[in-house]
Amino acid sequence: MRQPPISLVHGMHINLSGKTALVTGSTQGIGLAIARGLASSGARVAINGRSEASVQRAMDTLTAAVDGADLIAVPADVTTDDGVATLQAQLPTVDILVNNLGIFEAVPALEIDDEQWRRFFEVNVLSAARLTRIYLPGMTERSWGRILNIASDSAVATPVEMIHYGMSKTALLAVSRGFAKAAAGSGVTVNSVIAGPTHTEGVEDFVYQLVDKDVPWEQAQRQFMVEHRPQSLLQRLIEPEEIANMVVYLSSPLASATTGGALRVDGGYVDAILP
C-alpha cells in the first residue's frame, strides 16, 4: 500500500482543502467549535444533529463566522440504525470522522438504573464504534484518514456523581486504541482527545446542579472548580475552541505519526504525566 508523502512544517499552516469531515453532535458546544475549526482550515464539513432546526442554526452560525465555509447539513440521529442509514446515504465518503456526540448528567452512584447505564453506553460508545466501522474501510482503501473520539477526563478520573458517564468515556479510549490497531500501517490515524472541564451550555447546567442557582456565573464557575475540580492546574473551565485546536491539528497531515493515543486538553486536571 503506497503511503502519502509526509507533510513538512511551514509555519504550522494547516490546510484541509479537499477533505470531507463529519463531526457528530456539532450543533453546539465543543462539536460546533470543532466544525468551525475544520471549516476555517478548508475542509468540507458535515454538520450533524438530531433535528433539522438545530442543524440549520449551526449552519447559519458557521456561515457567518467562516468566509467561504463549505458545509453540508446532515440531520440524523446517529444512535439509531435508521439515522445512520440516512447519514451514510447523504455522506458516503468521509476523510475525517470526529465522534463528538455525547451525553452526561449528574446522578448519585447508587441511583443509576440499568436503562441509564445502557443509554450512556449506546450514545457515548456504540455510536462512535458504529460510524468507525462504516467509514474506516474507505479511509484505509484511500490510504488516508483521521478518526478522533472526544473523550473526557472522567475516563481516567471518574467523578462519583456520574460514574456511568465515566464508564462510557473509559470505554471510548479502549475503542480508539483498538481501531488504531486495526488501522495499523494504512495511513489512517485513530486518536482520542481527553477534554477537561469545558465551558458549554450543558456544563453550565451541570455546574448549577452542584452550585446554588442564584449565584452569578463567574462566581459559580470558580466555586465549582474549587469544590469539585480542585486538581485543575488551569483553575478555570476550558473554552471549546481550545479543544477544537487540538482536533484540527490531529485531523491534519501534520499529525501523521500520532495514532493510538489519548491526548489531553484538560488544563492539567488529570494528575499524571501520562494519560
Feature locations, PLM:
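Active-site helix of classical SDR
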Residues: 132, 168, 176
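Short C-terminal tail/terminal secondary-structure segment
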Residues: 2-15, 157, 247-248, 259-275
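C-terminal substrate-recognition "lid" of short-chain dehydrogenase/reductases
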Residues: 129, 136, 144, 189, ...
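Conserved glycine-rich cofactor-binding loop
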Residues: 20, 27-28
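Alpha-helical segment proximal to the catalytic Tyr-Lys
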Residues: 137, 181-182
